[in-house]
């Protein structure tokens, strides 16, 4: 966070006062006079001024907008942060809740003797999440897409080299009982 510090300024009566580069004061036109030079004002304010706490500035990013608050006491800022943290905890605890099946969401029947509390007694009732058909079938769709891709890639490789190349040399031909016709059948 950037703090903006106001520079002390000398008051000017009836004209325009301009500070030159070395910190002195100069008067442009008019009949007024500069009450104090800027150097005098700075030195007296530094000696007499107590270290004051600059006003707190709070910047909030919410809903796509930026809001800046100046001069908030630190107690209010801490309270706002506590409220925001509590809201985030509540939001996270409800969003992490497990998805339950419809059978678990049924209210207990009147003939039931179990001591399980009804869903209405829960502080945050579990809402069943409805999935779109495309969202629910997404892993299967990915699998089918991958399978189609691999088939097309295999077809491209086969079309590029339709016949397997043999790296056999004449010395690699077996000399045993196996004939060449059995090892490399034609047709």
From Swiss-Prot:
The jas domain (139-163) is required for interaction with COI1 and Pseudomonas syringae HopZ1a. PROSITE patterns: TIFY. Residues 51-86 form the Tify domain. SMART domains: TIFY. Residues 14-32 have a biased composition (Gly residues). This is Protein TIFY 3B. Interacts with MYC2, AFPH2/NINJA, TIFY10A/JAZ1, TIFY10B/JAZ2, TIFY11A/JAZ5, TIFY11B/JAZ6, TIFY5A/JAZ8 and TIFY9/JAZ10. It comes from Arabidopsis thaliana. A motif (Nuclear localization signal) lies at residues 141-148. GO terms for cellular component: nucleus. Residues 1-50, 152-187 are annotated as: Disordered. It is found in: Nucleus. InterPro entries: CCT_CS, TIFY/JAZ, Tify_dom. Belongs to the TIFY/JAZ family. Its main location: nucleus. Induction: (Microbial infection) Triggered to degradation by the pathogenic Pseudomonas syringae HopZ1a protein in a COI1-dependent manner, thereby activating host jasmonate signaling. A motif (Jas) lies at residues 139-163. Repressor of jasmonate responses. Residues 1-10 have a biased composition (Basic and acidic residues). GO terms for biological process: defense response. Disulfide bonds: none annotated. Keywords: Acetylation, Jasmonic acid signaling pathway, Nucleus, Plant defense, Transcription, Transcription regulation, Ubl conjugation.
């Amino acid at each position: 966070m950037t703090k903006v510090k106001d520079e002390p300024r000398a008051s000017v009566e009836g004209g325009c006062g301009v500070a030159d580069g070395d910190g002195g004061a100069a008067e442009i036109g008019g009949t007024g006079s500069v009450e104090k030079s800027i150097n005098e004002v700075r030195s007296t304010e530094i000696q007499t001024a107590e270290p004051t706490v600059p006003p707190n500035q709070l910047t909030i990013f919410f809903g796509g907008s930026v809001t800046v608050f100046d001069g908030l006491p630190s107690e209010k800022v801490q309270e706002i942060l506590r409220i925001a943290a509590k809201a985030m905890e509540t939001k996270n605890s409800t969003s992490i809740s497990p998805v339950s099946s419809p059978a678990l969401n049924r209210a207990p029947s009147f003939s039931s003797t179990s001591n399980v509390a009804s869903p209405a007694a829960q502080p945050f009732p579990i809402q069943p999440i409805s999935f779109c058909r495309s969202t629910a079938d997404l892993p299967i769709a990915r699998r089918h897409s991958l399978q189609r891709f691999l088939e097309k890639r295999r077809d491209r490789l086969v079309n590029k080299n339709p016949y397997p190349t043999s790296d056999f040399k004449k010395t690699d031909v077996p000399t045993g009982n196996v004939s060449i016709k059995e090892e490399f059948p034609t047709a």
